[in-house]
């Protein structure tokens, strides 16, 4: 159910962003909201608490976000409250972020190696990935796992290269 909710609302937000030529604006705004929600656990708990009435939650959204983010984003947050899905807000915004990255052909790659890679090795990995995929850039995440005997494991979405 959570995936369905995040997909429905995330797709609607993405379509609106594309239609209005505001993909970058919406992306920045949703990233900001994600930061606010992650830094303020009490806000998330309050917004999901069943004893706080919807009107109070709506007023809270207005007070916090109105004038700081677009009316479309405020409307989305209010709709999530209205439909009792505010607890899925992070999922919706992460889904939207992933859709934007795919739209802009920005891949996310997790590289795990047996030892720390040099700057040159990291550049070589990224260059090879750019040559062999349809992406124009990557968000690269590197991690060392001493349990690996040698080499590296590259994860990109649901693909794994060993």
Language-model segments: residues:
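Elongated, mostly alpha-helical coiled-coil "stalk/stator" tethers of large membrane protein machines
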Residues: 1-161
